[in-house]
Amino acid sequence: VAALAAYGNAAETMRQTRPECNLAWTTLAGIGHVETRHGRYRGASLNDDGYALPPIIGIQLDGSPGFARIPDTDGGELDGDPEFDRAVGPMQFIPESWRKYGVDANGDGRADPNQIDDAAVSAARLLCENGGDLSVAENWQRAVLAYNASREYVMDVRDSAAAYSVGTTAP
């Protein structure tokens, strides 16, 4: 429930601040589902304050088959890894993207990728900046590719978002 509320809030935030983006909450829900099952990856869950516990830290992005090679960009500050970057939180932000798009959306004075409200609005910012008008299919696809440069990922997000848009459970 916390994740869905965060996606709705993030879409509303974009409607007010970047109405030309036309971001649907279902796109964020699709990404949240594909990335971490809305903060429930590997036994994690969102607490009452919207934090993923235990924190969700992705695999080392060391260029292993199927994964990008991203040498460390933050001295391990965000992801705890001083050698390679790792995606962090329920929306799986890499440190470089978090530095660019991360915002405090829950009003606690701290932008934190492990907090679902912060992560959802930050994801919305990334999508809107990279896609423009997301009601245009090509722009939506470009935005999701900016989130994760994989055609399979785009299709998975599309399928999940479509399921949410008609009120069914994501695949």
Name every feature range the model reports, one short phrase each:
Residues 1-171:
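Catalytic glycan-binding domains that act on GlcNAc-containing polysaccharides
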